[in-house]
Amino acid sequence: MTNIRKTHPLTKIINNSFIDLPAPSNISAWWNFGSLLGICLIIQILTGLFLAMHYTSDTATAFSSVTHICRDVNYGWIIRYMHANGASMFFICLFLHVGRGLYYGSYMFTETWNIGIILLFAVMATAFMGYVLPWGQMSFWGATVITNLLSAIPYIGTNLVEWIWGGFSVDKATLTRFFAFHFILPFIISALAAVHLLFLHETGSNNPSGIPSDSDKIPFHPYYTIKDILGALLLILMLMLLVLFTPDLLGDPDNYIPANPLNTPPHIKPEWYFLFAYAILRSIPNKLGGVLALILSILVLAIIPLLHTSKQRSMMFRPLSQCLFWLLVADLLTLTWIGGQPVEHPFIIIGQLASILYFMILLVLMPIISIIENNMLKW
């Protein structure tokens, strides 16, 4: 009798994706982040569902409904903080996952890579709208500033912004629709993640050496299931350390002040995971230019496969490219720091230089260094 696991239409899909999947024998811990992102998404959907049971998306009661969740609902405080810090863990895993793709040349799977970029945009949109929901000062002013950027679009800008707001400012209509979108997007993200996996399984996983591993494959289960469980335990440990010891470490104290359209906070800034893009936005004095730079800071990932000039796929054996990669990481950390600073003398120029360097590394230096490495190897 043939195994039902391999024949039943439903279990067959699971079997071919997570059990009998042929995987390279040498993939490192950097390949754990895909499954960790899946776990993050599940945590966010579950905690978000329970929060939505008690949350009210009306300007008069939104802030107090979040307070009510934390004070009166059984374990509401832990659900709320798991959701807020779960978003931070989600973005840490996302950045490491994208960084792994850049380092090891995984972007050569163009379909998988492009779906990944769409996923990144979708998760960023979801996180932004989620930050508006508690209706604190940063929620309100963050929503005002970021949606207002769309007014930089020529001709239709102002109409577009007012259409998104549902009025002449961020108000009831805006909050209600943001809640609706924030609820639906994670399910769209789940579907996109399935497509992301579908395309990945067409080619199989890449590996640290960047060399095809068809001659040396091992089954996903038990080798990588147990490895993923270890990764999941470490992820949950880190999340719970944040939630139970320093739940407000990554948040902004201003968001504990109810939204007030008449009082602007001294420093309007987004959550930490958007600061690098916010710094790039602010480093350009022109409004439309800043918006374009902001979008391009993520969209630039889409042309990386076209700029791959090296004869090798991975950076494992390319020390010069490695130096550039880590310079890029340092540059992104610098941008993250600058994004949280006020617009004053030293920070403005540092932000502008870091922004220029970011695009220079990705668009100019990486392809040139790759060609130099090819020539050094007489290829």
From Swiss-Prot:
Heme b b566 binds at H97, H196. GO terms for cellular component: mitochondrial inner membrane; respiratory chain complex III. One of its GO terms (molecular function) is ubiquinol-cytochrome-c reductase activity. Keywords: Electron transport, Heme, Iron, Membrane, Metal-binding, Mitochondrion, Mitochondrion inner membrane, Respiratory chain, Transmembrane, Transmembrane helix, Transport, Ubiquinone. The chain crosses the membrane at residues 33-53, 77-98, 113-133, 178-198, 226-246, 288-308, 320-340, 347-367. It comes from the Eukaryota. Heme b b562 binds at H83, H182. Gene3D superfamilies: Cytochrome Bc1 Complex, Chain C (1.20.810.10). A ubiquinone binds at H201. Binds 2 heme b groups non-covalently. One of its GO terms (biological process) is mitochondrial electron transport, ubiquinol to cytochrome c. Signal peptide: none annotated. Its cofactor is heme b. It is a multi-pass membrane protein. It is found in: Mitochondrion inner membrane. Belongs to the cytochrome b family. The cytochrome bc1 complex contains 11 subunits: 3 respiratory subunits (MT-CYB, CYC1 and UQCRFS1), 2 core proteins (UQCRC1 and UQCRC2) and 6 low-molecular weight proteins (UQCRH/QCR6, UQCRB/QCR7, UQCRQ/QCR8, UQCR10/QCR9, UQCR11/QCR10 and a cleavage product of UQCRFS1). This cytochrome bc1 complex then forms a dimer. Heme 1 (or BL or b562) is low-potential and absorbs at about 562 nm, and heme 2 (or BH or b566) is high-potential and absorbs at about 566 nm. Component of the ubiquinol-cytochrome c reductase complex (complex III or cytochrome b-c1 complex) that is part of the mitochondrial respiratory chain. The b-c1 complex mediates electron transfer from ubiquinol to cytochrome c. Contributes to the generation of a proton gradient across the mitochondrial membrane that is then used for ATP synthesis. This is Cytochrome b. The gene is MT-CYB.
